[in-house]
């Protein structure tokens, strides 16, 4: 356990994952009394964004992105399942779809409530509600990249003052092959020409 007076710096580089795990991590971070800063050097989608919302400050690379947190039921977005109820009479919808729609409605309500809970003590209730609606109810596709500008327009506290040490840290972790498409972090030189290494005994 981190001491209550010790700040937490967390680097997020993830396509997301289980809502349960993300909510547990986010809840623990939100309860931490000292400052919590999340660093996003490239992307933190879905559950990664949910965790980021628990931070006091989000630091993103200028080209990094967050993503919507709308729940997915298997391969289907929960919000899209609910659209079926709006577009077809109940008599034309099979029982399995109706059951999935019930689960989808509950899932969206639960995730939206989590987002509001994470944000409410740092902004007004109305703004927290707005952000939760935008992120959790299927306004965008689940893989929509939310840029720094859009994150700020939503009302999130986002900085682009990424410490160089974060990039160096990312370069130390090899990326393992993944079955599902993702983003591989490949560290590149941060200057046009690499620094010359001086050879001992050489004037150059």
Residue ranges and their predicted role:
Residues 1-37, 44, 59-61, 71-204:
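N-terminal organellar transit peptides
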Residues 55:
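Extended, alpha-helix-rich binding/interface surfaces that flank or overlap catalytic cores
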Residues 47-48:
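Acidic, divalent-metal-coordinating active-site segment for phosphoryl/phosphodiester hydrolysis
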């Amino acid at each position: 356990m981190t001491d209550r007076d010790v700040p937490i710096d967390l680097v997020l580089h993830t396509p997301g994952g289980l809502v349960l795990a993300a909510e547990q991590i986010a809840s623990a971070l939100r309860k931490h009394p000292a400052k919590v800063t999340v660093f996003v050097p490239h992307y933190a989608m879905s559950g990664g964004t949910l965790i980021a919302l628990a931070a006091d400050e989000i630091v993103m690379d200028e080209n990094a992105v967050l993503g919507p947190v709308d729940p997915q039921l298997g391969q289907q977005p929960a919000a899209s399942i609910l659209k079926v109820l709006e577009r077809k009479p109940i008599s034309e919808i099979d029982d399995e779809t109706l059951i999935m729609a019930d689960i989808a409605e509950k899932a969206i309500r639960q995730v939206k409530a989590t987002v509001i809970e994470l944000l409410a003590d740092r902004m007004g209730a109305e703004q927290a509600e707005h952000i939760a609606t935008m992120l959790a109810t299927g306004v965008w596709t689940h893989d929509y990249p939310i840029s720094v500008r859009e994150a700020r327009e939503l009302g999130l506290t986002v900085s682009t003052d990424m410490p160089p040490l974060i990039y160096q840290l990312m370069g130390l972790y090899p990326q393992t092959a993944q079955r599902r498409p993702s983003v591989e972090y490949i560290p590149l030189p941060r200057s046009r020409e690499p620094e010359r290494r001086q050879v001992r005994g050489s004037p150059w």
